[in-house]
Curated annotation (Swiss-Prot):
GO terms for cellular component: cytoplasm. GO terms for biological process: fatty acid biosynthetic process; phospholipid biosynthetic process. This is Phosphate acyltransferase. It holds the Pfam family FA_synthesis. SUPFAM superfamilies: Isocitrate/Isopropylmalate dehydrogenase-like. GO terms for molecular function: phosphate:acyl-[acyl carrier protein] acyltransferase activity. Catalyzes the reversible formation of acyl-phosphate (acyl-PO(4)) from acyl-[acyl-carrier-protein] (acyl-ACP). This enzyme utilizes acyl-ACP as fatty acyl donor, but not acyl-CoA. The lineage of its organism: Bacteria, Bacillati, Bacillota, Bacilli, Lactobacillales. It comes from Oenococcus oeni (strain ATCC BAA-331 / PSU-1).
Length: 348
């Protein structure tokens, strides 16, 4: 019999909460038979949504507060002790849940993950990790970290992001020897500012890392790396540029095809299946969420606008993280390589 896991779900976090969160949780419950899902939030509203559905492997924990999307993160976490997010996070810390899911305030979830669940000993700064597709081969997914948690970094942070991303690629994406690259403004070894030049040397000499150099943002979707390491500012800017370009491109193309000549419309009908397939490659609803990597348990954030399908997919992502022993293996590796994790290149 498969080992069972309990996932704490912030049912009140997100633009479409609690409706889509509860629907997604029920989809995941039916799909993944070894998961128990604890929903934290307004019990009355959650019960209304569940209706006559059996509550098998579903538990509802009532909370009286919620953290809004626009609230100041750290202040909200400190003040709203009975919010769905904070109570769910404390359940993970206390051991009554194995992992945490939320579609709520990203900053608040970061604060909850870092200050309540806690950093893995030896990891200086946890970061946000996401998985993106390669356009030439949608099945070849790649890890991108950091995408927004740490705008300012040290070389050692970037090195640790590479280690965390490498573990995610091997454990969750099942890549045997992930190719690691550093996001930079050129491919040459001496490109970038002092931090990136020093980080390059750390990565180049890193133990058990298949580091193959720098990568420019224009190459991110071309399948040239399995793990891309970035500071949070550059990573977030690149991620939003990718998302924005995809949305703009498809909106512009749709406008041209709809308002074009008869020949254009006939052509549009012919290419529609191919365009639909390509758009699904870049559709975040088909993916999971962003992982707060470097904390003591899986903490995963999906888009605030997530629908039930995305919620279910993200819970499936957490399931793989738990079953692959991702966090315990990272913890063990960092503990066994403490000296390596203290390395910071001297300023030249």
């Amino acid at each position: 019999m498969d080992k069972t896991y309990t996932i704490a779900i912030d049912a009140m976090g997100g633009d479409n909460a609690p409706e889509e969160i509860v629907k997604g949780a029920l989809l995941a419950r039916d799909k993944y038979k070894n998961l128990h899902l604890n929903l934290y939030g307004d019990k009355g509203k959650i019960l209304e949504l569940i209706g006559e559905t059996k509550q098998d492997r579903i538990k509802i924990i009532n909370t009286t507060e919620m953290i809004e999307m626009g609230e100041e993160p750290v202040k909200a976490v400190r003040k709203k002790k009975d919010s769905s997010m904070v109570v769910a996070t404390n359940a993970v810390k206390g051991g009554s849940a194995d992992a945490l899911f939320s579609a709520g305030n990203t900053g608040a979830l970061l604060a909850s993950g870092i200050f309540i669940v806690g950093r893995i000993s030896g990891i200086e700064r946890p970061g946000l990790l996401t998985v993106l597709p390669s356009v030439d081969d949608p099945k070849r997914q790649w890890v991108f970290m950091d995408v927004g948690a740490n705008a300012e970094v040290k070389p050692s942070y970037l090195y640790q992001f590479a280690v965390l991303g490498n573990f995610y690629a091997t454990h969750v994406l099942k890549k045997p020897n992930p190719e690691v690259k550093l996001l930079n403004n050129g491919t040459e070894e001496d490109k970038g500012d002092k931090i990136h030049i020093q980080a390059y040397q750390l990565l180049k000499n890193g133990k058990q890392l298949n580091f193959t150099g720098n990568i420019e943002s224009r190459e991110l979707l071309n399948g040239h790396a399995d793990v891309v390491v970035a500071d949070g500012f550059s990573g977030n800017a690149a991620l939003k540029a990718i998302e924005g370009t995809a949305l703009t491109m498809f909106a512009g193309l749709r406008k041209i095809l709809v308002n074009g000549s008869l020949k254009t419309k006939i052509g549009a009908a012919l290419v529609k299946p191919a365009l639909k397939e390509f758009s699904s490659v870049l559709d975040y609803n088909n993916a999971g969420g962003a992982v707060i990597a470097g904390v003591k348990a899986p903490v995963v954030k999906t888009h605030g606008s997530a629908k039930a399908k995305t919620v279910s997919n993200t819970i499936g992502q957490i399931k793989i993280m738990l079953e692959s022993n991702l966090v315990p293996d990272i913890t063990k590796y960092v503990d066994e390589n403490k000296d390596q994790f203290k390395i910071i290149l001297e300023e030249k």
